[in-house]
């Protein structure tokens, strides 16, 4: 492997397209900083150097090959931020398998769809999260697993492509491999075969698949490449001036790009230590930053609010903090100022992007004036073209004029898995990726988000897609038709609201709708507000005017926009941080 061509130490420097696989990036960092911390779980007493982490990844990769996992197979991981998660991210990359990230909020309905549509062959999972038993959910979808005499070779009627299920721990579960068993198999993989597999990889191979929805239909599997996420992670870290001396506190979910690209790959590219929390808890974040002397911290606005409002906040020494990223939803200036002044994050940055962009298009610089870091989402990362264009085409509009935000470059996805029509709608023949967001770019290239073309709702950093919830609610007895919109909320940015036309004699209300949804779809998708109506506002051609419903929602439920922000994230389950979009990343 040749030495990388890196930019000079100050600023972005000249762009060089460094096309490496993720395995090559890790190997290079392990060779440069073998004895520095790579992965730390402070609450577990778990700590690996780069040499140790690279060795663990090699053993796991060989074990996966011994299981029979082939290049191009999907390997789903349904887990919180456990230590095995990041090892699996690089082990799959080393053998050319595609890591399929699964949201831990998913229930049976969503898991069945994602594993089925992706034609996933392998699943790694933990046992449970809060009141949700992952193993029992899987057994209910694939009951054949419960009666298998041994692990491997699954034949499931509902998931016909799934062959192997692995438990991310030492415990044995019916029909599943354990992690010690997989590591023990590593000696069965011949060195020549292992090296040949790595040599067969192309940096433009798909290596990561994440499911994201649009306003028209169910989630789509976004295929991302080694080069796309690897180089994106490099420049995200570069904008923060990461070096091997930095230590990033990472409390955001790894199943979103915010965790596995902005976090993990930024650190691996620069040799910075990853101080990971399994789930978000504001007290645990403050403890980890102080104990590990973290220099950077990530989070969505509600997470930073919860940390600042924690009753013991003033007791913690956060003087080591320098930089980080706030993303996931709108980042208000008063909050940014508190983070800068009270948490010492004077070089905090803001990102913008979407999963299809690997995920970051633009990011502010640590030296940008604070007003620019509050009012804009920064400038395009090196190697990525960003323009504001006419929504009906791809022609660039004059600076200062609002239009749709597009990007083109190494970061654009390969496409949606087995959805060529959707891919063609998202990416123009010239290679421009449509964001669906509206923005304005100034003369200096700083981008400001002004709205969304899409109807997507962002609740506390989690992307919520109305069409998916509408199709689900149409299965509820008594519901004739339904429209889902975002309701303004000071606490979460937006809440989910549903307008329902009932069947004759039925009278669904908020409680009955929530009861119907509970346990079947992710909690953040369940409507908080419900209104029964006789009809929806229509255009002359019969199309539903959703913008009028959004206005009606704001009038019906004004109290939602007046909820206090203090401690907002603390009252919700641990994974409120989410899939950044809008003023966000991935």
PLM regions with names:
Residues 67, 95-184, 504-506:
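Structural core segment of the AMP-binding/adenylate-forming
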Residues 230-247, 254-296, 310-312:
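Conserved AMP-binding/adenylation subdomain of ANL enzymes
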Residues 106-116, 123-127, 297, 409, ...:
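AMP-binding/adenylate-forming catalytic core of the ANL superfamily
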Residues 163, 521-543, 562-567:
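AMP-binding/adenylate-forming catalytic domain of the ANL superfamily
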Residues 19, 34-37, 158-162, 166-173, ...:
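Conserved pre-ATP/AMP-binding loop-to-beta segment of ANL
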Residues 168, 182-187, 269, 291-299, ...:
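Gly/Ser/Thr-rich phosphate-binding loop
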Residues 379-383, 393-426, 462-464, 557:
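Conserved ATP/PPi-binding loop(s) of AMP-dependent carboxylate-activating enzymes
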Residues 18, 27, 35-82, 86-90, ...:
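Conserved AMP-binding/adenylate-forming core of the ANL superfamily
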């Amino acid at each position: 492997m040749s030495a990388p061509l890196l930019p000079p130490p100050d600023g972005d420097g000249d762009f060089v397209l460094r096309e490496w696989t993720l395995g090559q990036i890790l190997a290079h960092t392990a060779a440069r900083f073998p004895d520095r911390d790579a992965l730390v779980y402070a609450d577990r007493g778990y700590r690996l150097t780069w040499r140790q982490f690279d060795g663990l990844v090699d053993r796991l990769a060989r074990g996966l090959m011994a299981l029979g996992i082939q290049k191009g197979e999907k390997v789903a991981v349904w887990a919180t931020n456990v230590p095995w998660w990041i090892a699996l991210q690089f082990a799959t990359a080393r053998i050319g398998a595609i890591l399929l990230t699964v949201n831990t909020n998913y229930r049976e309905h969503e898991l069945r769809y994602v594993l089925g549509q992706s034609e996933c062959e392998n699943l790694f999972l933990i046992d449970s999260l809060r009141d949700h038993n992952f193993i029992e959910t899987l057994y209910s979808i694939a009951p054949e697993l419960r009666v298998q005499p041994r692990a491997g070779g699954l034949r499931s009627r509902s998931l016909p492509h799934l062959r192997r299920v692995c438990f991310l721990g030492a415990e044995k579960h019916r029909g599943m491999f354990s992690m010690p068993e997989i590591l023990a198999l590593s000696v069965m993989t011949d060195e020549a075969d292992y090296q040949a597999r790595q040599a067969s990889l192309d940096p433009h191979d798909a290596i990561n698949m994440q499911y994201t929805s649009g306003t028209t239909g169910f989630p789509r599997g976004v295929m991302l490449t080694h080069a796309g996420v690897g180089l994106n992670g490099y420049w995200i870290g570069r904008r923060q001036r990461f070096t091997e001396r930095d230590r990033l506190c990472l409390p955001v979910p790894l199943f979103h790009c915010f965790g596995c690209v902005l976090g993990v790959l930024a650190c691996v590219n620069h040799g910075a230590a990853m101080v990971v929390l399994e789930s978000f808890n504001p007290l645990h974040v403050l403890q980890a930053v102080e104990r590990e002397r973290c220099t950077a911290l990530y989070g969505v606005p509600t997470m930073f609010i919860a940390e600042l409002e924690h009753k013991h906040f003033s007791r913690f020494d956060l003087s080591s903090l320098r930089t980080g990223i706030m993303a996931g939803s709108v980042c208000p200036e008063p909050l940014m100022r508190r983070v800068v002044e009270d948490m010492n994050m004077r070089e905090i940055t803001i990102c913008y992007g979407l999963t299809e962009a690997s995920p970051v298009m633009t990011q502010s610089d640590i030296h940008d004036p604070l007003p620019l870091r509050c009012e804009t989402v920064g400038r395009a990362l090196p190697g990525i073209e960003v323009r504001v264009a006419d929504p009906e085409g791809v022609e660039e509009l004059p600076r200062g004029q609002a239009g749709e935000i597009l990007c083109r470059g190494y970061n654009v996805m390969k496409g949606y898995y087995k959805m060529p029509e959707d891919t063609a709608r998202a990416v123009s023949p010239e290679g421009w990726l449509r964001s669906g967001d509206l923005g304005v770019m100034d003369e200096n290239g700083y981008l400001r988000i002004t709205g969304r073309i899409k109807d997507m709702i962002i609740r506390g950093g989690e992307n919520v897609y109305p069409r998916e919830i509408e199709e689900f609610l149409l299965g509820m007895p008594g519901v004739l038709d339904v429209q889902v919109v975002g309701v303004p909320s000071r606490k979460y940015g937006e809440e989910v609201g549903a307008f329902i036309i009932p069947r004759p004699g039925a009278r669904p209300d908020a409680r009955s709708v929530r009861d119907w949804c509970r346990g079947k779809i992710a909690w953040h998708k369940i409507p908080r507000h419900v209104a029964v109506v006789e009809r929806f506002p229509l255009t002359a051609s019969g199309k539903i005017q959703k913008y009028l419903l959004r206005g009606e929602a704001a009038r019906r439920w004004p109290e939602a926009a007046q909820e206090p922000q203090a401690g907002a994230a603390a009252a919700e389950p641990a994974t409120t941080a989410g899939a950044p979009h809008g003023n966000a990343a991935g």
